[in-house]
Curated annotation (Swiss-Prot):
Disulphide bonds in the chain: none
Transmembrane segments: 9-29, 31-51, 68-88, 91-111
Organism: Schizosaccharomyces pombe (strain 972 / ATCC 24843) (Fission yeast)
This protein's record includes keyword RNA-binding: no
The protein, known as: Protein transport protein got1
Protein's job: Nonessential protein required for the fusion of ER-derived transport vesicles with the Golgi complex. Can be replaced by sft2.
Gene: got1
Residues exposed to the Lumenal side: 30, 89-90
Length: 129
């Protein structure tokens, strides 16, 4: 599947958002870098998925708590509370994408060097009895 020009710009915007977020974290939670990274991530996500799909993703009933905490963290970061906003935003991010964790773990099990460690962490030991 080929990406449209808008989706290609969205991928670049999302990558820049991750870069600015990482730079903001490394610079001791620098507020302007975190704010810029947040805005670029959200705009990139909207460009990749499209407006209607993004709105339906964030407004689903089972993801409402994650959406509220994610956008609350984004607003806290924008209003000069970067540390609190970052952690609230991370909580929202984990709640938004928690349905994808089994898929990510099953993919990581197939990666050659990471797979055995993931198997040790996620598999349980059955008792011999």
């Amino acid at each position: 599947m080929w990406l449209s020009d808008l989706q290609k710009i969205g991928v670049g915007t999302t990558a820049l958002g991750f870069l600015f977020m990482i730079m903001g974290i490394f610079m001791f939670f620098d507020g302007p870098l975190l704010s810029l990274g947040n805005l670029l991530l959200v705009f990139g996500f909207f460009m990749i998925a499209g407006f209607s799909k993004s709105v339906s993703f964030f407004l689903r009933k089972d993801r409402m708590l994650g959406s509220i905490s994610f956008f609350s963290g984004l607003l806290l970061t924008l209003f000069h509370f970067p540390i609190i906003g970052f952690f609230v935003e991370c909580l929202g991010f984990f709640n938004l994408f928690k349905v994808f964790y089994p898929l990510i773990i099953s993919f990581l099990r197939t990666v050659p060097y990471i797979g055995p460690y993931i198997d040790r962490l996620t598999s349980y030991q059955q008792s011999p009895v």
